[in-house]
Regions:
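Glycine-rich NAD(P) Rossmann-fold beta1-alpha1 loop
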Residues: 20
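N-terminal Rossmann-fold NAD(P) dinucleotide-binding loop
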Residues: 23
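Short glycine-enriched loops at secondary-structure junctions
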Residues: 43-45, 122
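Short acidic/His/Gly/Ser-rich catalytic and metal-binding motifs that mark active-site loops
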Residues: 47-50, 125
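N-terminal Rossmann-like dinucleotide/flavin-binding domain of flavoprotein oxidoreductases
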Residues: 50-109
Length: 130
């Protein structure tokens, strides 16, 4: 008897890969443009800002704030304007022809007219004493 693997195929106008400030902002603007974006959250939901204790000079926070608070506010705004969010990791993307084909968690396939890659960066610590 073979295992039952359920594979999903989904079409979207706009797929956003990444859930940091750039991903959520892309979601907000593409949703307002009626592109009905799907945002795949990735490994670290909220990006590096979620591990930042103090953020200064960020628009809308004249007194500063913590990274997690800012990211929660941006995420809530994205949800409010209709961004669909889904957990998972995009494991493969085929940009060779349109529409683009993307795979999430090595199984679910998403076909998208537009793909926005907002995967952010990863901190590389120098290992210097504090």
């Amino acid at each position: 008897m073979q295992p039952n693997f359920e594979i999903m195929l989904q079409y979207v106008k706009c797929l956003i890969i990444g859930s940091g400030p750039a991903g959520y902002t892309a979601g907000i603007y593409t949703s307002r443009a009626d592109l009905k974006p799907l945002l795949i959250e990735g490994i670290q939901v909220g990006g590096q800002l979620t591990i930042t204790n103090e953020v200064e000079n960020f628009p809308g926070y004249p007194e500063g704030s913590s990274g997690p608070v800012i990211m929660e506010d941006i995420r809530n705004q994205a949800l409010h304007v209709g961004v669909e969010m889904r957990p998972g990791i995009v494991t493969k993307v085929d940009f060779s022809s349109r529409p683009f084909h993307c795979w999430v968690d090595d199984k679910d396939e998403i076909v998208a007219d537009t793909v926005i890659v907002a995967t952010g960066a990863q901190a590389r610590w120098l290992g210097l004493p504090s």
